[in-house]
Amino acid sequence: MEEKILPIALRNAIKYNGKANPKAVLGIFLSENPEYRSKAKEVMPIVEKVVEEVNKLSLDEIKKKLEELGEDVKKKEKKEKGLELPNVKDKVVMRFAPNPSGPLHIGHARAAVLNDYFVKKYGGKLILRLEDTDPKRVLPEAYDMIKEDLDWLGVKVDEVVIQSDRIELYYEYGRKLIEMGHAYVCDCNPEEFRELRNKGVPCKCRDRAIEDNLELWEKMLNGELENVAVRLKTDIKHKNPSIRDFPIFRVEKTPHPRTGDKYCVYPLMNFSVPVDDHLLGMTHVLRGKDHIVNTEKQAYIYKYFGWEMPEFIHYGILKIEDIVLSTSSMYKGIKEGLYSGWDDVRLGTLRALRRRGIKPEAIYEIMKRIGIKQADVKFSWENLYAINKELIDKDARRFFFVWNPKKLIIEGAEKKVLKLRMHPDRPEFGERELIFDGEVYVVGDELEENKMYRLMELFNIVVEKVDDIALAKYHSDDFKIARKNKAKIIHWIPVKDSVKVKVLMPDGEIKEGFAEKDFAKVEVDDIIQFERFGFVRIDKKDNDGFVCCYAHR
């Protein structure tokens, strides 16, 4: 058995800088050798012994030992280098460019992480560009929220650029396009223009004289015109109608949270983005393949100004289900009192995940694994939770927790003091104490009359009556008797000195119950494991007990 465990432990140690995790190794071993699953408790000491020996070795010694077992570590490392950018000549300049309409959510993390990863890999600069040229979609507090979220995620920003600070710059380049005859002011009715565009027919404004366009442009800037746009001259017969003379400036008189009513003409994304990407010196741009058409539109800007285009990498769509990601829906829900805030555990914001106990390293790692492949990807919450578990398991103290509690009175059993480790693998964490004196809380819907149960780490009972208060009789101590009778193992909390706990679940449910008395020692922000329930982060501690946020199993 040790021969099978050793290579798993060595690979795990290489993955985590020379330190293998016994539980992770056991999990891999059991998945590869399912015949041992029923003997997991017997296998664990062997795994711990192998891991202990492996962790004494240096990283080079671990690699050498794995090679002695026939694995080509260098080839594997080369293969796992994985993420590469095309056409890297020197240092790279990249950008993460969210709209400040709210804090970042899990979907934003992919672009943030991958841009950061490549800048760190190749050297260079990462620019945070806040694209706030639509006053209607700007949340003032989001500017700082986004910076805070990136800092927590471990993304290092070298420069912050805010587009609303650059409006005059966009005007300068917009005017140049008009002067070159590549853009024109269009006052056509939008529906009429759409009909002409779909037929591949130019509108009446397209051939207007440059001088007349410049005069109209100035009137736009002075707030004298409404319902007009500046359009870029492209191919009016282009196979994709959306690319035919698309708009690059529009009139918007909604006051901007940062600049007030100073401006009433704003650039559209397919103008401001290429101008900024060029002037800020972008070498590589990561974007979803849903932006392929935008890349084609922006190519006209590069062509007209004679600029070299950066390297565009279009990756597949990341499909994220079972969570709220729409910023407008979240904002509306917060305003209406449906959600407690941007960190409500039902939401998909990084703040909500942080509150639940998801580590930034776990999010960073899963986004690296998803990478820049062109195929669409369905996001796996289970994979994120598995990575997070590897990070938190070793430090998470263990406690019992019962929810929807029912009081159970047990007759015929003597008072007993039970001492259990705070962590099965960390004796230095000390012990916790549970004192049985006849009355306990158990999970409310677990009991049936005339059935045997085993109170975890204690003894066997037979339930006689289930009512508002349940009654049972002591049966025996021997675990073998419980196994023979197929008795369900249940958690229990002594009624005396129990601690009130609420657990906020991601689906909106609130599980109320009790934890054991030593749970009172935990502090806010600790991450612990309620055995057979899951990992939780301590969110609040007061005279009414504790509020915890559920992370995962």
Curated annotation (Swiss-Prot):
Residue ranges annotated as motif 'HIGH' region: 98-108
Recorded catalytic activity of this chain's protein: tRNA(Glu) + L-glutamate + ATP = L-glutamyl-tRNA(Glu) + AMP + diphosphate
Record-level GO cellular component terms: cytosol; protein-containing complex
One GO-annotated biological process of the protein: glutamyl-tRNA aminoacylation
Function field: Catalyzes the attachment of glutamate to tRNA(Glu) in a two-step reaction: glutamate is first activated by ATP to form Glu-AMP and then transferred to the acceptor end of tRNA(Glu).
NCBIfam families: gltX_arch, PRK04156.1
Entry similarity comment: Belongs to the class-I aminoacyl-tRNA synthetase family. Glutamate--tRNA ligase type 2 subfamily.
Descriptive protein name: Glutamate--tRNA ligase
